[in-house]
Amino acid sequence: MNKRKPDWLKIKLQGAEKSHEVKDMLKRLSLHTVCEEANCPNLIECFGRKTATFMILGSVCTRNCTFCNVTKGLTQAVDAEEPSNVAQAVKELGLKHVVITSVTRDDLPDGGAGHFAKVIEKLRPTEVIVEVLIPDFQGDREALDTVIRAKPHILNHNIETVPRLYATVRPKASYARSLELLKNSKELDPGIFTKSGIMVGLGEQEEEVIAVLQDLRAVDCDLLTIGQYLAPSAKHHPVIEYIHPELFKKYKDVAYEMGFKYVASDPLVRSSYHAADVSHIIG
């Protein structure tokens, strides 16, 4: 698709000066953010507000999703200092809500679940709301339980797209497995808030998106994000369509009618964009 981006996807650059402070701190503490690795369009705004989504377990992924800009290839050794460094970064930024995500580490026996737990445990003594955005751990319920037992406030796992597109968009993932993870999360801890997200503009149909929302509610998913897919480069899955803001509003209205507790649906929404907006729900 060669069509130019519509006006509603144009971003005002603000907060650039403060964003350098965040980048300097991340470098000092040897930390990665999904904001940088995924080439997020909201990076300057979020860094300018001194918020970030920390990406643990290195910067190299074992999966080959065609929508993602994170580096694929040979993985790195797990940094034992990372949990302490994340906690220090959260303290320096004065965060009230922190999002921790990771590359997918299919090469690790537990998929990195134990490392997630260590990061959460370092943050739990603070007042910060801890949200984790986790991979599917290849369906390993024990790995999921390891994360759940560490007591994050929000368990996020993105469904990403409609089932029909998984073969081309997420070839190593499974729609059913992702739904099962969200279902199991509630079974392991009924009090945890679960969250998921979907990208649109990949070639899905409106009725397919509605069906995904129904599937998410069927496993008692609480929080939802819907955003426009933007291809990081010409080598990635192409943008098939730029979805009009009115359709995002429709998805939002439909989702609330289904019973989601919080819905962010807008072209520039990303999974952790303005994540702290749910703080009034978490309590």
Curated annotation (Swiss-Prot):
Reaction it catalyzes: [[Fe-S] cluster scaffold protein carrying a second [4Fe-4S](2+) cluster] + N(6)-octanoyl-L-lysyl-[protein] + 2 oxidized [2Fe-2S]-[ferredoxin] + 2 S-adenosyl-L-methionine + 4 H(+) = [[Fe-S] cluster scaffold protein] + N(6)-[(R)-dihydrolipoyl]-L-lysyl-[protein] + 4 Fe(3+) + 2 hydrogen sulfide + 2 5'-deoxyadenosine + 2 L-methionine + 2 reduced [2Fe-2S]-[ferredoxin]
Cofactor, how bound (note): Binds 2 [4Fe-4S] clusters per subunit. One cluster is coordinated with 3 cysteines and an exchangeable S-adenosyl-L-methionine.
One Gene Ontology CC term in the entry: cytoplasm
A GO MF label: 4 iron, 4 sulfur cluster binding
Names of the cofactor(s): [4Fe-4S] cluster
Pfam family, one: LIAS_N
Record's keyword terms, sorted: 4Fe-4S, Cytoplasm, Iron, Iron-sulfur, Metal-binding, S-adenosyl-L-methionine, Transferase
Record-listed [4Fe-4S] cluster 2 binding positions: C61, C65, C68
Residues involved in [4Fe-4S] cluster 1 binding: C35, C40, C46, S272
Primary subcellular site in the record, as a coarse category: cytoplasm
EC number: 2.8.1.8
PANTHER family: LIPOYL SYNTHASE, LIPOYL SYNTHASE, MITOCHONDRIAL
Family to which this protein belongs: Belongs to the radical SAM superfamily. Lipoyl synthase family.
Name used for this protein in its record: Lipoyl synthase
UniProt organism field: Desulforamulus reducens (strain ATCC BAA-1160 / DSM 100696 / MI-1) (Desulfotomaculum reducens)
